[in-house]
A protein has these predicted regions:
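Acidic, metal-coordinating catalytic segment for phosphate/diphosphate chemistry
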Residues: 1-41
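Residue-level detector of conserved, well-ordered beta-strand and adjacent loop positions
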Residues: 26, 54, 142
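Short, hydrophobic/aromatic-rich beta-strand segments within well-structured domains
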Residues: 41-43, 51-53, 114-117
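A generic structural signal for short beta-strands and their flanking turns/coil linkers
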Residues: 38-40, 60-62, 94-97, 112
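Short glycine/serine/proline-enriched coil/turn segments at secondary-structure junctions
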Residues: 34, 60, 107-109
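Charged phosphate-binding loop/patch that engages nucleotide di/tri-phosphates or the phosphate backbone
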Residues: 158-181
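Conserved Nudix-box catalytic region and its N-terminal flanking loop in Nudix hydrolases
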Residues: 45-87
Length: 181
């Protein structure tokens, strides 16, 4: 049976089955790491809600999630967020308009998720949506609910807590400051 990360990526020598990370190769001395993968997720306020996508790919196909995905080599988290938002929804935003909302390690610590807050859009200004390889539909949520990933659910809840636990003016100020910083 194949075990992922069971051999040195430099010389191919097998690691001990219970060897801790990072792993030092006994044959060549190379040090191997298994680091979390970086992910960029976009919080796009639309009117009084937040944009979500219904996933058309695994994991969690058919479930609602915030738009986002893996950060490619050579991309900033803002560039990745803008790219993923466009790929999944057809919506264009400028990477420099994204502001950090929160950073969270996903359960199991296999991914490190950067949640970026985009500038608010009006629903009539959104481009027409067509289902694609990654997204079945887009939906604007106006209250917290369970999403495909626990980090998305927690972040959605936090977004609405900031929005609803303050006066409308305070919430606008808090969220606008997050976008303008």
């Amino acid at each position: 049976m194949f075990r992922q990360h069971s051999h040195c990526s430099y010389c191919g020598h097998p690691f001990e089955a219970d060897q801790a990370w990072p792993r030092l190769c006994a044959a060549c001395g190379n040090i191997s790491f298994v680091n979390p993968l970086p992910v960029s997720v976009v919080l796009l306020p639309v009117d009084d809600g937040l944009l979500t996508v219904r996933r058309n790919i695994e994991p969690q196909i058919g479930q609602l999630a915030l738009p986002g995905g893996y950060i490619n080599r050579g991309e900033s988290w803002q560039q990745a967020g803008a790219r993923e938002l466009y790929e999944e929804t057809g919506i264009i935003i400028q990477p420099e308009d994204l502001r950090e909302f929160r950073v969270k390690s996903a359960p199991g610590y296999n991914t490190l998720v950067v949640f970026g807050l985009a500038q608010r859009m009006r629903a009539p200004d959104l481009p027409p949506f067509s289902p694609n390889d990654e997204t079945q539909e887009i939906r604007v949520l106006t209250a917290p609910q369970e999403l495909a990933f626990s980090t998305h659910t927690e972040t959605l809840r936090e977004y609405f807590e900031v929005k609803f636990n303050h006066s409308a003016a305070e919430a606008r100020s808090i969220l606008q400051n997050a976008v303008s910083q």
